Amino acid sequence: MKHSKKLLLCISFLLITFFIGGCGFMNKDDGKETEIKQNFNKMLNVYPTKNLENFYDKEGYRDEEFDKDDKGTWIVHSKMVIEPKGKNMESRGMVLFINRNTRTSKGYFIVNEIEKDRKGRPINNKKKYPVKMKNNKIIPTKPISNDKLKKEIENFKFFVQYGNFKDIKNYKDGDISYNPNVPSYSAKYQLSNNEYNVQQLRKRYDIPTKKVPKLLLKGDGDLKGSSVGSKNLEFTFIENKEENIYFTDSVLFSPSEDNES
């Protein structure tokens, strides 16, 4: 009888210990999830910035990677990738280096069609067209004979100029993940075709599918802040071996470099 009571007490103690320990792990996970969400909220605060010249006066996260007198450079990058079934993958996008020291902005409009050779290996056909930004307008810095392409470049808008995440708290099916070994972290949300950002993308790009996209926020580096890590977002419409349709965007603050543009 005494042995039965001791055994019962022992089992009860183990169950209580396990329960408390489990609660501890749960609190840690909840805390990390909150930290990740707060980190992405800081990233999304720049959306929208309609006038790109506002970045000249916008401060970013600084650490020991920055020289004392370096005000830093904002790097904005937007790209649409479309690979219809049975066709080549094509990407069209732009990257702009907004230098706060010189208050000048230079970059490239980049078109890349990826073909495959006889062995199925990818072949890049990348073309870069140099541009500058002045008075919030994109201007090609070299002659472009193709009028349609020239107009596409001049009318280009970065996602940060029109994207808006004020309703992110209402996004459904939030899936938060964290890998401490890299470290890397992400948040995935299922969107609807009625969502503002999705409507804006469909308005600006000829997206050959009516499928509802998912929003993936990705980051790596120290969650508390680092100029070495990166953050970007992706709207994934279709992703498989035969067909890919997605849009990527990033706004990064980095130490300035002489050869960056």
Curated annotation (Swiss-Prot):
**Listed InterPro entries:** Csa, Csa_sf
Task: Tell me where it mainly resides.
Answer: membrane
Keywords attached to this entry? Cell membrane, Lipoprotein, Membrane, Palmitate, Signal
What is its membrane topology?
Answer: Lipid-anchor
Q: Tell me the leader sequence span.
A: 1-22
Where does the record place it? Cell membrane
GO CC terms, sorted: plasma membrane
Lipid modification (N-palmitoyl cysteine), residues: C23
Tagged with keyword Cell membrane: yes
Covalent lipid attachment of type S-diacylglycerol cysteine occurs at C23
For this protein, the record's Pfam families field holds: DUF576
Q: Which family does it belong to?
A: Belongs to the staphylococcal tandem lipoprotein family.
* The protein's name in its UniProt record: Uncharacterized lipoprotein SERP2445
Q: Which organism is it from?
A: Staphylococcus epidermidis (strain ATCC 35984 / DSM 28319 / BCRC 17069 / CCUG 31568 / BM 3577 / RP62A)
